Amino acid sequence: MPRSLKKGPFIDLHLLKKVEAALEANDKRPIKTWSRRSTVFPEMVGLTIAVHNGKQHVPVYVTEDMVGHKLGEFAATRTYRGHAADKKAKR
């Protein structure tokens, strides 16, 4: 179920402060965050945000199409290595 409109979109306060500081300083370095639950705001467009996937920080360049989505959607947490090969087919 989607979030109520009267509440508005969620963003962690510490991430918002980092974004505002990067915009003010015109800093192009990636902003490191563990907040996968934060919503992408229009102010973030053009910034690179390093989102933690449980193992490492994945750099995500924010575009206009990403606004309204969650940061965690752009950093996959699981790797698919494929199913085991059929032993009979190898012979």
Curated annotation (Swiss-Prot):
One of its GO terms (biological process) is ribosomal small subunit assembly. Keywords: Ribonucleoprotein, Ribosomal protein, RNA-binding, rRNA-binding. One of its GO terms (cellular component) is small ribosomal subunit. The keyword Metal-binding does not apply. InterPro entries: Ribosomal_uS19, Ribosomal_uS19_bac-type, Ribosomal_uS19_CS, Ribosomal_uS19_SF. The keyword NAD does not apply. It comes from the Bacteria. One of its GO terms (molecular function) is rRNA binding. Protein S19 forms a complex with S13 that binds strongly to the 16S ribosomal RNA. Belongs to the universal ribosomal protein uS19 family. This is Small ribosomal subunit protein uS19. The lineage of its organism: Bacteria, Pseudomonadati, Pseudomonadota, Gammaproteobacteria, Pseudomonadales.
